[in-house]
Every structure is written in C-alpha cells, then in structure tokens.
Amino acid sequence: MGTAKKNAWRTWGGRILVASWLSAGVGCGASADLFVEEGLASERQAAGSTYEAESAALSGGAVIATDHAGYSGSGFVGGFTDGNKGNAAAQFTVSISAAGNFDVTLRYANGTGSAQTLSLYVDGTKVKQISLGATANWDNWGTRTDTLSLGAGTHTLRYKFDTTDSGNVNLDNLTLSAQATPPPAGSGPLYEAESAALSGGAVIATDHPGYSGTGFVGGFTDGNKGNAAAQFTVNASATGNHDATLRYANGTGGAQTLSLYVDGTKVKQISLDATANWDSWGTRTDTLSLGAGTHTLRYKFDTTDSGNVNLDSLNLTAATPPPPPPTGSGFVYEAEEQFFSGGVAKESAWLRDFSAPGARVIFTVNLDAAAATSVGLRYLNNSGTNKTLNVYVNGVFALTTTLAPTGSTWSGKTETLSLRRGLNTITYQYDSVNTGGVDIDALTVVNGKALADRGATVPYQELEAEAGTTNATVLNPNRTPGTVEAESSGRRAVKLTQTGHYVQWSAPQAANSLVVRYGMPDAPAGGGINATLSLYVNGTKLQTLNLTSRHAWVYGGYPYGDSPSTPSKPGEWDPGPHRFYDESRFLLSSSIPAGATVKLQKDGGDTAAYYTIDLIDLEQVEAPQPMPANFVSITSFGAIADDNGDDTQAILNAISNAKSTGRAGVWIPSGAFNINSRVTLDNIHLRGAGPWYTRIQATNIGEHFTGTGSNVKVIDLAYFGNVVERNDGADRAAFEGSFGTGSLIQNVWIEHAKVGYWIRPGTDGLYIVNGRVRNSYADGINLHAGVKNTMVSHVHARNTGDDAFAMWSDGAINENCTFRHDTAQLPNLANTFAIYNGRDNKLLDSVGADTHYASSGVLITDWFADLPFLGTTEVRRVTFNRTGGEQTVNFSMNAGAVWVHGVRREISGHILVEDVEINDSTFSGIKISWGKGASTNPPVNNHAISPVTLKNVTIKGAGAYGLETFNVPGTATCTNVTVTGAALGGLSNHNNRYTFNKVSGNTGW
C-alpha cells in the first residue's frame, strides 16, 4: 500500500465546498459558500488553526512517514493498516478560545480506490464514524470536514482505526476553524428548490405553471433512481421541532415516495400524494427536531423509492404541537407511546404516514369492567377530503371509520366499541379498502385507566408465601446458586413438612382462579411425583389441588437432564440438583370473595414429604369469549375437545378452509386440543375462548406453531408443552419462525415449552402483547438474528430456563426492537433481559427480579456474535430487584444488575441508561467490563465501551460496588447517579482506565 492518500473538496454535511463567493443578485450576500454534492474537485484548504499530524499523540502502530509527496509540515502519519486494526490512532490536542460550532477539517490521502472509514473521538468519547473518499493516488490529498460543538478550553480530537472501521489511509494535518454560516437557499423561511444543491440528474425546469420563484426541480425520473437529489441548506433560529413543508407536483395518479435526509442521515421515507395533474401543486409537512443553526435537508430518489415527482420549494417554520386533548371522563392514551408499524412514523407528540396499506397503530388500553365503551380518536386530516381507516378490537374487525377533513387543526371522531375487562387492543389500520392519509395524536377511552407504571399490566394479584401467616418453616434469604432459597421469589418461601402445616393470606380481590408456584420432591429415578394439597377458604375446604413435580428438577452439567444420573460436563456449571419449582393453575369450583382467608394446607391425604410454597396468583377470570362472526371452528373438521386424540390435521384443514373461502379466521373453542406436529401460520387469524379455556397441548416434545408469512394473528389461547429437560439440538419453541409484517399475538399463555417465542429473520412489525411465559427450559422470548420493528409488551415471564427476554443479533442484527412494560421474574439461568448487539434496540418501563446464576438484570454484550452496536441502545424507566449473579463458568467474574460487557470488539454505539432503579443487587449495581476476567492483572484490553450515558440512576444496596469497571477504557457521562448501601464502596475503577464525566447530582461514589 505504501503508507496509507483523493483530491476532494472540503465537505460540509454531505456537500462539498466549491468556492467561497457568489456574486450578489442571486438571493445571497456578496460573500458566501457554494455547495455541491460530493465528487472530484481540486483541493481547498479551510482557514483556521492547523495542527500537523506528525505532532499529534500517536499510538497503536500509527507512525510518522515521508515516502509520499504533497504533505505539509515535516511529514504525515501512516500505520493505519490492517495489522493495526482496532489500535492505530492519532490524537490532536486543540485549544478553543470561545465556545461554538467549529469545522474540523482532516487532510488525508486514500489511494485504495474506494472510501475508507475511521472513528472520531472528542475528549475520549466516540462521536461518529467518518468516511474518507478515495483520492487519485497516495500522493494526492483530500479533506474531510466535520462540524463539532466545542466549549472554550482544551480538547482532544482522536482519529482511530476502530475494529468497525476499514482504515488504510494516511493523515497529514487537522485544521480547526470557527464555523462560517452557509447562506440560506432562499429568502426568509421559503427555500426555492431551484436554488438548492442538485445532483444525480435533478434539474431546474419551467415547463409546468404554478411554481414559485424562477422554476422548479424535476429529473426525479426512473432513469435517475438511486441518484437524483435536491439538498436545501436551512437555518433553524432556535432548538426545537420544526415543520418542513415541501411543495411538490405528482401527476402520476398515485402516491409516490422520496427519502428525507437531515444533516446527511436518512430519517424517513416520505409519501407524496397524487396531485390533480402536473400543473397542480400539493404540500407535504414533516416535523423535524433541529438544533439552533444550519442544517441540510435532502430529498433523494433512493433505490427503495418510487420518485417521479417535481419539487417547487421548502418552507421551514417552528412547529406548533397539537394542543392537549380536551379533558373529560376518559383516559387518554397517547399515540406515540403505542406500537405502530407499516411505515407509520413517530413525530414528537403524534404519529403520521398512514399512507399505504399495512400502516397501523395498536392502542393497548385497560378497563375495570367489560362494556360498550365510547372511544375518541384525535386526528388531523388536511387533505380536503374524507379519509378512512379500519378499526379492530382485540384483533377482530369492528368497523370502518370515516375521518372528515380538519384543515390544519386537530379534531376528534367518536365510536362505540365493545371492550373486555383488563387489557384490550384497538387497532387503526390502513387496509387495501381504505384511503388513509391522516395523522393520529391520541385515543380517549371512557372509563379507561392507566397501565402499570413499570412492568406488565396483569389481571391477577401475586402473593408471596413469606408475606402470609404460617405455622410452618419460613426459609431465610440465601442467594447461593443451587439452593431452593436462591430460586425463590424474594429469596424466601414457606416449607410445609407436617400434616396441619399451612400458609394463608387475605385475598386482596375476588377471584375464581388460583396459580400455585411450589416445589415437591422428585422421584428417585427422576420424572417427578404426583401429590395433592388442600385449599381452604375462610376455614372451609374448597377443593383438593392436584400437583406434580414432573416439570421440576434437573441435574448434571448444562443443558441439564431430567435424570439424577445426568453427568457433569467439563467447563459447564453443575450446582447439583436445581429447578426446584413448577406451577399449577386451577379454575375454582366456587369464587373467593375479596377479603377472604385463602389457605394452602398439608392434610393427611396430601402425601408429598414436603411442599415448598413460593407464591400464589389470585385472578378473577372472565367468561369464555364467543366465536366471532365469519370464523370457522376446528370442530367442524373433526377436532374433539378433551378426548386425548390428535387434532393437528383438523386445525390444518380449518386453516386451509378459512383461506380458500375468505373466512375471517379459525376458531378453537374451550377445551384441550392436542397437536403432534407443526402448525404453520401465514395470513391467518387463529383464535380461542381465552387462555384459561382454550388449551393447545403438545403430546410429544417439540410440536409448535411456526410462522411462515405475514398478517398472522394468534389470540386468546394457551399452549402447554411436554418438555422435561432442555435439548438444544431438537426441541422447538411454542411459537417460532418468521411472522413477516402486520402480525399480532395477544393474550397467549405458554407453559413447559423449551422456549416461549423464537422469532426469526423476516419478521418486521410483530406485536406480542398481554401474555404469560411460564416454566420454560430455555429463553422466554428471543428475537433472533435480524428481527425489525417488533415490540413485546405487557408480557410476564417467570421461571425461564435461560434469558427471560432476549434480543439476539446472530448473523444479522436486530433493529428497532423494544421490550416495554414487561416483567421478568426468576430466570433459573441467565438474565431477566439481554440485548446482544443490534441497532436502536430498547428496554423500557419494565421490571426484572430475582436472577439465579450467570445473570444480570440486563446484559448488553457482543458475547455471541462479532456484530456491532449501532445507534442508541436504551434502558429507560426500568427497575431491577435482587438481580446480578455469579458468571464464573463463562467469564470468571460476577455480573452487575446492569452489565455492559465486551468480548469480541469495541462497543461504540451509544448506551443510554436513564431513570433506572437498582435495588439490592447481588454484586455490583452497574458493571462495565471486557473479556474473561480470570486474572486480577489480565492482558490490557484496548477495546473501548463508549459512549455510555448514566442519568437518574438510583442504586440502593449492592453486594459489591455501586459502579464497577474491569479491564476496559471508555467514557460515561453521569448525571444524578446515586449510590447507597454498597458493601465494598461506591466505585471500583479497574486500573483507573475508565473515565466518568460527572455532570451534577452524583452522590455516594
């Protein structure tokens, strides 16, 4: 390569500075900067202070060289070669006299023939990956300009060949200059398209009337697909939301699309409705969050767009948010807080882009009682004509709503919908019969109520055994893996060992059902035992409960076996027998009144040697749901409830019939129905009478539902597997596969599966809501290897055999997936939540509690795949109770409640931890680390984890430190991080290699 050199012009936000003047009389001042799209040109050196690369601090193999011509100073810096990937860096120390925005211009050579990348760090924090276009050869030099906001004083600017970069460039110097403000492309708030920077075939035209200014811009034709663009340079007078209104013509007869880029980054695809003809003009407004100052707004005909429009002008104004919905008797559910998919975009306080079939928002609402309920949709329709959307309630079509024009103001449309007690979904969807084209702000539901602040909203009350009264033994807290206490909720339980032993509670609500989480002995050869336990209400025996330990007890090394003879495995954790608990559920013979005494008692006929009671759930179950109109029942195809026969073919035949005859879906009535092979799902609605009534039973191991396409709905049923040990080579999930676009899984209860949900690539916009995953042998929910735009919400997972909730980027990254309002409780192995690589994934408004082994409250890591973290990974508004645990087998270290851990590469995506409560962490509250951790003096790791933001984090009680780092560099910015009750101290910063920038409000460390 020689040492690692394009003559390029100075770039500014994706444009190239061609000259520093324009003649007066074209809408600009006499002195200005002219911008064009990136391309070849002669070099222009930015004015300002110049820092030679050979005088910078060099590391990781970066060296001074002189073997190529054209450099400034006494040499240039090379060594950014593949052999130094992950290490080579040049760090400039610059001085700023006054705070402001600065152009940082790097002079470089790149003779590789293609663009190469480096990473730019400011004061130790990575701010971006930069692209350095190819220069003509290694003796020619180009420049790359980045705009940075810098405070007065000294700063470090570091260009590093990170593990995610391609490197192989030479660096000559760095020029720092106060930013000159580019002129607006027009006068005032109106920017004419003919004055924008045009590229890729976009041209000025005048052959259609009605345009403003001196012309319009065309050329967005199929021949220029992937290239044509118009870039406006605009000025935002103040930080905030701004409405960017594009005036355009679209005479094609149908909606067309372009892509909108802000400051070089694509933010959305926009839809431009048809205008009457090419001489008529329409507008499209997008609300953008912009900082004060200059920005570029680029409208491009990307390869994924349909183009074929003309552009006239752009108007930028401060956005006026919709006024708050009028107050009334209803509860307001904000649209931007709901699940949405199908191209719908989120603005600061509402949703837009209901512009094509498949666009939808699903409101999750909560009621105290079933009723015909008034709901009011707050919307905006500035089209001048009526628009329509279809409305679905809990997945069933309810009506088509017509939304009258509103002009530029928000209005409301009220409907009456039949809603059930508890959680409901109300979907507003653009189907093929609709016209869409509205914005949606909120839904007001009369007699609606708030969802749980954190964690899943559930219909039952969970009561801990140790919180009741008992004459038996209360187990004391213990977190030693392999003990029954460590597997108990709150680390305590009650053990009934003698006839007459009981534990009892006062019922906080009326209930007609009961779930018991309990432990009993195993059979000597494994396989479990069956025994009874007695249920009393107000001193009178209500019924005998039939219990089993068949799905408890595992042995040996990972992944553990059902037999006590299962051998240990070298290098695998083997604590001895564990997985002591299982659960059983019961619809009761009569209801329990609120305030009644509920007692579990070991009577003379209850023959197990002991019953360890961890907790109970009390729930008032509603009556079975009826079959909706236009559904076909599986009983019409030979399925028989509760007969122990195989019903797989009947279900498959019903699905085939529903598709071929245009029926709305397939009905599975009350009762138990058996499957012994896979049931494939695509473009079908499968529905039951409710998870307490409709029960799908896997008669062997591994039968399940497989997603093979889009528009799948599975609602109101339970799946009970027949798994008794983990088999990573064979067993399947209850729900597995690709669910395409537009799918919904609601109110589904899963027990005794290997995995609850294993969602595969091709899934884009799945919503899983209002579910329970209990007693799985591996993960509860795993979004695996390329899942996009998917949300899991109001799901409660308990006693999973691996991560309760996991996003696992494996081969391909998961993008924009969210766990929100979920509860993860008592994973027997691993974490309550885990995010393995990916882009812009989120854990929000959730609760994790009582991890056991190899465990965190949330683990953020690249452990399993050499893939990056991109964008921002968010953990916000989450509570972790008694989480963290030993991780001695895999990493020879202990895990924090919040654990950010690197194994394969630098973690350079932003990690945001905000509004998080960490209570009684087993080890450290927050841990940031890298590698295996086997030695107190490991080989020095230079893979940074940065940037990290910790904001409004409370750590109350930790078995080790409040915050801990191990063998890792990087930077965390900390605001209002408080530590109390950490056994070993507030902070342990291994070798002082990690930088904590304390802003304000930090105490205890």
Regions inferred by a protein language model and the residue ranges of each:
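Acidic Gly/Asp/Thr-rich repetitive segments characteristic of extracellular carbohydrate-active
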Residues: I634-W667
